[in-house]
Amino acid sequence: MSRIGKKPVPVPAGVTASVEGQTVKAKGAKGELSFVVHDEVLVKMEDGAVRVDPRDQSKEARSKWGMSRTMISNIFVGVKDGFEKKLEISGVGYRAAMQGKNLQLSLGFSHEVVYDVPAGITVAVPKPTEIVVTGIDKQQVGQVAAEIREYRGPEPYKGKGVKYAGEKIVRKEGKKK
């Protein structure tokens, strides 16, 4: 069993952190985030680091312990550097373009797919076959990337569709004559 929770989360340079009850707040160059820690976990500031401990030795408290530590670490990284996910589009005629604040996707349907980008997330299209999703909240960046990918996930025969950069698509063999 992992014991990542034992390790205190150091507050990086350029980030101010505060603990108020069960809420951890972080403010940095990219913005401000807060995370409410589960009641089964105790959280406190010690020597420029945030320490997380289980309230007792119950299974629920121990299961929330490591997750809470990682979530706090993610908000520190998010407000300092931010998070980024890249998507690649492959297929004849498949492309993406920004239309104001919305992402317009041509994915082989009879209509264009228009994705409304949520607040706090930035979507860029450096090339028509490449989408870059950035933001300070790791969960929200991953969610937006997953929603874009869901419109036309990669298919196993030709690999056409939207996939994460670096994602391996398990290919299938076609019909034999």
Curated annotation (Swiss-Prot):
Top-level taxon of the source organism: Bacteria
Gene3D superfamilies documented for this protein: Ribosomal protein L6, alpha-beta domain
Molecular function (Gene Ontology), one example: structural constituent of ribosome
One protein family per Pfam: Ribosomal_L6
Function as written in the Swiss-Prot or TrEMBL entry: This protein binds to the 23S rRNA, and is important in its secondary structure. It is located near the subunit interface in the base of the L7/L12 stalk, and near the tRNA binding site of the peptidyltransferase center.
PANTHER family listed in its UniProt record: 60S/50S RIBOSOMAL PROTEIN L6/L9, LARGE RIBOSOMAL SUBUNIT PROTEIN UL6M
Family per record: Belongs to the universal ribosomal protein uL6 family.
Protein name, per record: Large ribosomal subunit protein uL6
Originating organism: Brucella canis (strain ATCC 23365 / NCTC 10854 / RM-666)
Taxonomic lineage from the root: Bacteria, Pseudomonadati, Pseudomonadota, Alphaproteobacteria, Hyphomicrobiales
Encoding gene, per UniProt annotation: rplF
